[in-house]
UniProtKB/Swiss-Prot annotation:
Residue ranges of coiled coil: none
Pathway where it operates: Amino-acid biosynthesis; L-arginine biosynthesis [regulation]
GO MF terms held by the record: arginine binding; DNA binding; DNA-binding transcription factor activity
Domain of life: Bacteria
GO biological process terms on file: L-arginine biosynthetic process; protein complex oligomerization; regulation of arginine biosynthetic process
Family: Belongs to the ArgR family.
Major location (coarse): cytoplasm
Keywords: Amino-acid biosynthesis, Arginine biosynthesis, Cytoplasm, DNA-binding, Repressor, Transcription, Transcription regulation
Gene name of this polypeptide: argR
Naturally occurring in which organism (per UniProt): Acidobacterium capsulatum (strain ATCC 51196 / DSM 11244 / BCRC 80197 / JCM 7670 / NBRC 15755 / NCIMB 13165 / 161)
GO cellular component, as recorded: cytoplasm
Name this polypeptide is given: Arginine repressor
Length: 148
């Protein structure tokens, strides 16, 4: 089946009922005849701008449209999913709960903070690149306050 068909199936499954994990979503896709790996599903989730909130995975605006007002709030996702921040010169490594790095990185990216050049999200880790060490320290302190 095509990528387009898989994306439609993902949207439909998430709209139908709460999905708590990527593995649960992957199993539901397999039952529908899609041969999908965790890596492919991770890319699909990123491309569809799906985020993981307290109730499970959700589509932006509930229908897959990309509208900034419907993105998760950085304070909400950081306090829910952020665990710790480690600084390495001008870079920060933000450790999150499993499966939560994508929505955290998305929320940080959309804050448009001058301390952030860009983010790179894995499954439970976000790499944040800052322009210099001083701004990395400022951002680390801000994120640690949000995490609590």
């Amino acid at each position: 089946m095509s990528k387009h068909e898989r994306h439609n199936a993902i949207r439909e499954l998430i709209a139908q009922r709460p999905i708590a994990s990527q593995d649960e979503l992957r199993r539901k896709l397999v039952r529908r005849g899609f041969d999908v790996t965790q890596a492919t599903l991770s890319r699909d989730i990123h491309e569809l701008r799906i985020y993981k909130g307290p109730g499970g995975y959700a589509l932006p605006n509930g229908n897959g449209h990309d509208e900034q007002d419907d993105l998760p709030d950085v304070d909400e996702v950081m306090s829910s999913f952020g665990l710790k921040v480690k600084q390495a010169q001008n870079q920060l490594v933000l450790v999150t709960t499993a499966g939560s790095a994508q929505p955290v990185a998305l929320a940080i990216d959309h804050e448009d903070w001058p301390e952030v050049v860009g983010t790179l999200a894995g499954d439970d880790t976000v790499l944040i690149i800052c322009p210099d060490q001083k701004r990395a320290t400022v951002l680390a302190e801000r994120l640690e306050k949000i995490i609590g």
